[in-house]
Regions:
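Short acidic capping loops at alpha-helix termini that bridge into adjacent secondary structure
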Residues: 41-43
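Active-site-adjacent loop and "lid" segments of alpha/beta metabolic enzymes
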Residues: 1-37, 52-138
Length: 138
């Protein structure tokens, strides 16, 4: 999983030249290290670390440009469930969590852009929404 800095300081003004390109390069490098250490590539999933050392805008940019991370050829794990970025997007600058509805919306957006592994808290709500999204997609 990608994380800028360490947990105590990761949210203090995180800066990237290009958040998606920077994280793609990090994940590609870590994938190479894991494979070189003997882990079969087909057993590896990549996690861009939504909410870990990223601003609200960084998190949404990662979802918008998910195809650039999918180009690494591995399944992506997206964990946007209950993230403070969702609450902040919806107008609460002091949010420490996001609502279930916002979490489901973010999961559907990630799914529609190719995420195959979603880390969620409210499983039933996500399954229902993703079932509908899959039916619409055909």
């Amino acid at each position: 999983m990608h994380m800028l800095g360490e947990p105590r300081t990761m949210q203090i003004d995180p800066v990237y030249e290009d958040v998606v390109s920077d994280i793609a390069a990090f994940l590609e490098e870590r994938l190479g290290v894991a494979v070189a250490a003997g882990i079969p590539e087909e057993r590896i999933c990549l996690d861009p670390g939504i909410g870990f050392g990223k601003t609200v805008e960084h998190n949404f940019e990662l979802i918008r440009r998910l195809d650039e991370l999918l180009a690494l050829g591995r399944p992506l794990v997206i964990g946007f469930s209950r993230k403070s970025s969702l609450g902040k997007l919806l107008g609460d600058p002091e949010a420490t969590t996001g609502s279930v509805a916002a979490s489901v919306g973010a999961a559907v957006a990630a799914y529609e852009r190719g995420a195959t592994i979603l880390r969620v808290h409210d499983v039933r709500e996500h399954v229902e929404a993703l079932t509908v999204a899959a039916a619409v997609a055909g």
